């Protein structure tokens, strides 16, 4: 277990680990317990009622945050011809085909946050799986990153669309903004993320889908959320 410093221990005193806080209290606390000198990220951690060892119960998809992530998202697009031109026009940071494939394959280059590809390019980038896969950057139809409408995809990811997937413990992690965001903006992102997440319940997942939810700022303590304060039908 990592050792926590003096500042962490000080802010930890503000949080009752046995209490589930309503959404407004939780957001107030996440701001109070942020102690980094930089503008930390507020992240939502959700324990799902799934068996992650079963492929048909794994959750992967995208969540669109109405107030964005507060992050400058670097988007790479694998495309050629007219699609490449559309991607550049939409604001993609890197656009190319064989040149980008070789750079990633030979140098292990991954200085981007999202990779989008047109379907016809996928056969070429399959060999990049060993580099992109472990970093969660491999284009996927489920994540909306394999598409012919590259311009729309670029705009959506730049505006606050994020890919989500459960980890090996059945938890899912979603950045919902920066500590500097207004509380109302964080709240809107949080509720929207929950609404979208509840719609991703796998058919073979029985019982309660949302088991537990915690929010925390970068390096800050976790704050338990009272799920009943969210009024979501899929929580029960």
UniProtKB/Swiss-Prot annotation:
The keyword RNA-binding applies. CDD domains: Ribosomal_L1. The keyword Lipid biosynthesis does not apply. It holds the Pfam family Ribosomal_L1. GO terms for molecular function: rRNA binding; structural constituent of ribosome; tRNA binding. GO terms for biological process: regulation of translation; translation. One of its GO terms (cellular component) is large ribosomal subunit. It comes from the Bacteria. Belongs to the universal ribosomal protein uL1 family. Part of the 50S ribosomal subunit. Binds directly to 23S rRNA. The L1 stalk is quite mobile in the ribosome, and is involved in E site tRNA release. PANTHER family: 54S RIBOSOMAL PROTEIN L1, MITOCHONDRIAL, LARGE RIBOSOMAL SUBUNIT PROTEIN UL1M. This is Large ribosomal subunit protein uL1. It comes from Petrotoga mobilis (strain DSM 10674 / SJ95). The gene is rplA.
């Amino acid at each position: 277990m990592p050792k926590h410093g003096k500042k962490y221990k000080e802010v930890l005193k503000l949080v009752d680990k046995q209490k589930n806080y309503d959404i407004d209290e939780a957001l107030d606390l996440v701001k109070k317990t942020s102690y980094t000198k930089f503008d930390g990220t507020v992240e939502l951690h959700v324990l799902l009622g799934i068996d992650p060892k079963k492929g048909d119960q794994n959750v992967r998809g995208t969540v669109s945050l109405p107030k964005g992530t507060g992050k400058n998202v670097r988007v790479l697009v694998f495309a050629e011809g007219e699609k490449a031109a559309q991607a550049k026009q939409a604001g993609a940071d890197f656009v190319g085909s064989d040149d980008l494939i070789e750079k990633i394959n030979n140098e292990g280059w991954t200085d981007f946050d999202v990779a989008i590809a047109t379907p016809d390019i996928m056969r070429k980038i399959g060999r990049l799986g060993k580099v992109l896969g472990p970093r969660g950057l491999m284009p996927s139809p489920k994540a909306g990153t394999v598409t012919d409408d590259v311009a729309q995809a670029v705009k959506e990811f730049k505006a606050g669309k994020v890919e989500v997937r459960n980890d090996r413990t059945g938890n899912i992690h979603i950045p919902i903004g920066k500590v500097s965001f207004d509380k109302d903006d964080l709240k809107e992102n949080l509720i929207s993320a929950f609404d979208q997440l509840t719609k991703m319940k796998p058919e073979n997942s029985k019982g309660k889908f949302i088991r537990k939810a915690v929010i925390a700022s970068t390096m800050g303590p976790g704050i338990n959320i009272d799920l009943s304060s969210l009024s979501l039908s899929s929580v029960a």
